[in-house]
A protein has these predicted regions:
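Acidic (Asp/Glu)-rich catalytic clusters
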Residues: 19-26, 46-70, 107-116
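Residues that form or flank phosphate/diphosphate-binding pockets in enzymes
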Residues: 13
């Protein structure tokens, strides 16, 4: 069994800083967030000009491997909810939110393919989302 760390726990820090920190603590794998605005990995941007390979090389330079890409926020919009509760993720109509969530999750899958990562994590949606918590977390 390998022990991994979800990088979005430190989304305010650059990904390389998190990779170094978790490697120093003895972790072996890194789960990287790919939802819009996460501050560490813009999936659409990483798909350009070999940037995905650079990111993978950086992670591996710390003795880690990428265990998964996670698209927690944006993928939630594919199945809803679609009201004001999720306007912090994407403000738009139901159809626009579905399109945004779908495209974002597809970009995560495309990036996973480039990185040779076999796992992409998404959320299926939750009724009355805002009642439980605001995402991303309130600072």
């Amino acid at each position: 069994m390998k022990l991994g760390f979800c990088a979005q726990n430190y989304s305010e820090k650059p990904l390389e800083e998190v990779a170094k920190m978790v490697a120093d603590k003895g972790y072996e794998a890194l789960e990287i967030a790919t939802y819009d605005g996460n501050g560490q990995c813009d999936a659409a941007e990483m798909l350009k000009n070999g940037k995905a390979k650079e990111m993978r090389k950086m992670v591996e330079s710390h003795g880690l491997f990428i265990s998964a890409l996670s698209n927690h926020a944006d993928s939630l919009l594919i199945m809803g909810p679609y009201g004001d509760d999720t306007d912090g993720i994407y403000k738009g109509t139901k159809e626009e939110k579905i399109k945004f969530g779908t495209e974002s999750l597809l970009n995560s899958a495309r990036l996973a393919n480039e990185l040779e990562v076999s796992v992409v994590i998404g959320f299926t949606g939750i009724e009355n989302f805002g009642r439980f918590f605001q995402f991303p977390y309130a600072k």
